């Protein structure tokens, strides 16, 4: 529950403050597959005054060595799994490694607002597809610029649900998070879904996609092209039951075929697309137009719309 979540976040605040001297602005790396503790440590580090560094644990050691060398983490909370270079990480940062649940025995802290609107809050590395990976600096101000849009979009989701699924009276929606939490599209869900008090269903491995989806009913899902195509095939082939109620796939339409999106919309899926770079939290513009003519439209000012 959110009550338990907040208590654990308070414990994490205590843990980080007790284990990182002069913590303000110090870096806390998070290197783990998706799990509950990822959210706890993210909020805990930020509320303690530290800077969260999300780490793609599946990068090569030279890539990780470069990135960690740039940020100089004071601690790295991690899941202990060897993704291919565990011995290198232990040799270089063994004294800074902590388990993801290191906070569990700490006393809950009183929360104090110590984060300035323009203070560095998160460092998120790019994929490195255009050269060496770069750390994008996110503050509270630019990180939460899109939250109002996200909350309004939540209202649009409810409007759609009430119109198309009036028999379902549960307005506590849930989001299936299968994309990794080091990716902005999933990381931001830790924050924006909490604004509504809605649920985030975390899945750690794409190989368990259908199993986890079957265990956790979800309304929305952030998708990469492979997942959107899988959803499309399930709908087309009469296997929609496998999706356990998913009705709002969200992606970036630049990646998807417009005809496929339109057909999914005709089959009762609410298609959402977001546009933007990491600096705008991936949601500089949100398009939830379901009309075939505009479902794949890249966002433009209102006076450009037909």
Briefly describe each language-model feature range:
Residues 13-59, 177-178:
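Conserved AMP-binding/adenylate-forming
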Residues 144-174, 181-245:
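Conserved AMP-binding/adenylation subdomain of ANL enzymes
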Residues 43, 47-106, 110-114:
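Structural core segment of the AMP-binding/adenylate-forming
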Residues 11, 32-33, 50-68, 80-83, ...:
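ATP-dependent adenylate-forming carboxylate-activation enzymes
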Residues 107-125, 131-132, 158-174:
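Conserved pre-ATP/AMP-binding loop-to-beta segment of ANL
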Residues 219-223, 232-294:
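Gly/Ser/Thr-rich phosphate-binding loop
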Residues 1-3, 121-149:
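Conserved AMP-binding A3 loop
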């Amino acid at each position: 529950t959110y009550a338990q979540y907040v208590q654990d976040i308070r414990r994490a605040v205590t843990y980080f403050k007790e284990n990182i001297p002069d913590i303000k602005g110090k870096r806390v790396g998070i290197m783990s597959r998706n799990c509950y503790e990822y959210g706890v440590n993210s909020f805990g580090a930020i509320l303690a005054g530290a800077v969260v560094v999300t780490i793609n644990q599946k990068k090569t050691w030279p890539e990780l060595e470069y990135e960690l060398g740039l940020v100089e983490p004071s601690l790295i909370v991690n899941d202990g799994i060897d993704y291919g270079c565990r011995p290198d990480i232990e040799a270089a940062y063994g004294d800074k490694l902590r388990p993801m649940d290191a906070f569990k025995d700490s006393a809950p802290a009183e929360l104090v607002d110590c984060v300035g609107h323009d203070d560095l809050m998160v460092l998120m590395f790019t994929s490195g597809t255009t050269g060496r990976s770069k750390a994008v600096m996110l503050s509270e101000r630019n990180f939460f610029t899109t939250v109002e849009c996200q909350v309004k979009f939540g209202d649009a989701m409810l409007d759609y649900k009430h119109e198309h699924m009036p028999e379902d009276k549960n307005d506590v929606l849930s989001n299936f998070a299968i994309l990794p939490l080091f990716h902005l599209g999933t990381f931001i869900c830790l924050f924006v879904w909490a604004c509504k008090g809605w649920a985030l269903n975390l899945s750690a491995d794409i190989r368990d996609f259908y199993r986890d989806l079957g265990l956790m009913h979800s309304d929305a899902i952030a998708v990469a092209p492979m997942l959107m195509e899988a959803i499309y095939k399930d709908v087309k082939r009469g296997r929609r039951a496998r999706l356990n109620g998913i009705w709002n796939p969200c992606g970036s339409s630049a990646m998807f075929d417009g005809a496929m999106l339109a057909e999914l919309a005709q089959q009762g899926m609410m298609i959402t697309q977001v546009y933007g770079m990491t600096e705008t939290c991936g949601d500089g513009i949100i398009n939830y137009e379901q009309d075939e003519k505009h479902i794949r439209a890249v966002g433009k000012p209102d006076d450009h719309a037909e």
